[in-house]
């Protein structure tokens, strides 16, 4: 996967964790 996609997924995961 492109590094950009990895960063997007990582950021999304962090945002989801913050919502919990």
From Swiss-Prot:
* Annotated keywords: Antimicrobial, Fungicide, Protease inhibitor, Serine protease inhibitor, Vacuole
Cytoplasm in keyword set: no
Statement: the UniProt record of this protein carries the keyword Ligase: no
User: Single GO molecular-function term?
Assistant: serine-type endopeptidase inhibitor activity
Q: Give the source's domain of life in one word.
A: Eukaryota
Q: Name one GO cellular component term.
A: vacuole
GO biological process terms held by the UniProt record: defense response to fungus; killing of cells of another organism
Q: Where in the cell is it found?
A: Vacuole
Protein role: Inhibitor of serine proteases chymotrypsin, pepsin and trypsin. Has strong antifungal activity against the human pathogenic fungi C.albicans TIMM 1768, S.cerevisiae KCTC 7296 and T.beigelli KCTC 7707, but lacks antifungal activity against the plant pathogenic fungi C.gloeosporioides KACC 40003, C.coccodes KACC 40803 and D.bryoniae KACC 40669. Lacks hemolytic activity against human erythrocytes.
- Report the family membership: Belongs to the protease inhibitor I3 (leguminous Kunitz-type inhibitor) family.
User: Protein name, please?
Assistant: Antifungal protein J
């Amino acid at each position: 996967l492109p590094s950009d996609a990895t960063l997007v997924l990582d950021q999304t995961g962090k945002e989801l964790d913050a919502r919990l």
